[in-house]
A protein has these predicted regions:
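Extended, charge-rich alpha-helical interface modules
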Residues: 1-87
Length: 87
């Protein structure tokens, strides 16, 4: 599993299998996971910063991380396969 998908798995451990499977076959989802991993890393960096803009950046990254997490959930829900009923 790549590091970006692992970030999504850490956030949604009960969805690890679908995350890994979708990441393996969907480039857009891999990109979404990469954006999520980057945003989480930046959030942690800013939380540890002493910069004057720290609070502003932390607030911005919290919003971004939550939005990307919501997109991950939505993508996973939309990717669920519903089997056809047997005839």
């Amino acid at each position: 599993m790549d590091e970006d998908a692992y970030a999504a798995c850490r956030r949604f451990p009960t969805q690890a299998k679908p995350i890994i499977e979708l990441s393996a076959r969907d480039e857009g989802f891999r990109d979404l996971c990469a954006d999520f991993a980057t945003a989480e890393a930046e959030l942690q960096k800013w939380r540890g910063s002493q910069h004057i803009l720290r609070e502003q950046r932390v607030s911005e990254y919290v919003v971004l991380v939550e939005a990307l997490a919501g997109e991950i959930v939505s993508t996973l829900e939309n990717a669920s396969v519903v089997p056809f009923p047997r005839r």
